[in-house]
Amino acid sequence: MGDVEKGKKIFVQKCAQCHTVEKGGKHKTGPNLHGLIGRKTGQAPGFSYTEANKNKGITWGEETLMEYLENPKKYIPGTKMIFAGIKKKPERADLIAYLKEATSN
């Protein structure tokens, strides 16, 4: 899998303006991502999701994140996430490695 330190840099550059990862972190434009791995789409408590996110019904893990982060709007049409995605698979792997560590209990 990916490199956690490289993934942290990617998170800071591309994700942190809209997301937090720490336990009890605030929702911003996007939901707090703590507890992401193993959670179903559209389930962060207290965040207002689109119906598309709530109805997708997948569980976040390495494979689903790998596909989603390549092109969020293609994976969940109707998501309000405006991020275009990360085309390079090694960068997605690094980000996922960071998210697995940073968002776990």
UniProtKB/Swiss-Prot annotation:
Listed Pfam families: Cytochrom_C
UniProt keyword annotation of Iron present: yes
An annotated GO cellular component: mitochondrial intermembrane space
Post-translational modification: Binds 1 heme c group covalently per subunit.
Residues recorded with modification N-acetylglycine: G2
Entry function: Electron carrier protein. The oxidized form of the cytochrome c heme group can accept an electron from the heme group of the cytochrome c1 subunit of cytochrome reductase. Cytochrome c then transfers this electron to the cytochrome oxidase complex, the final protein carrier in the mitochondrial electron-transport chain.
Source superkingdom: Eukaryota
Taxonomic lineage from the root: Eukaryota, Metazoa, Chordata, Craniata, Vertebrata
Family matches, as SUPFAM superfamilies: Cytochrome c
Classification via PROSITE patterns: CYTC (PS51007)
Record key words, sorted: Acetylation, Electron transport, Heme, Iron, Metal-binding, Mitochondrion, Respiratory chain, Transport
PANTHER family given in the database record: CYTOCHROME C
Localization: Mitochondrion intermembrane space
Name of the protein: Cytochrome c
Predominant cellular place of this UniProt entry's protein: mitochondrion
Record-listed heme c binding positions: C15, C18, H19, M81
Any GO MF annotation of the entry: electron transfer activity
InterPro entries (UniProt xref): Cyt_c-like_dom, Cyt_c-like_dom_sf, Cyt_c_1A/1B
Keyword Membrane recorded: no
Family (UniProt): Belongs to the cytochrome c family.
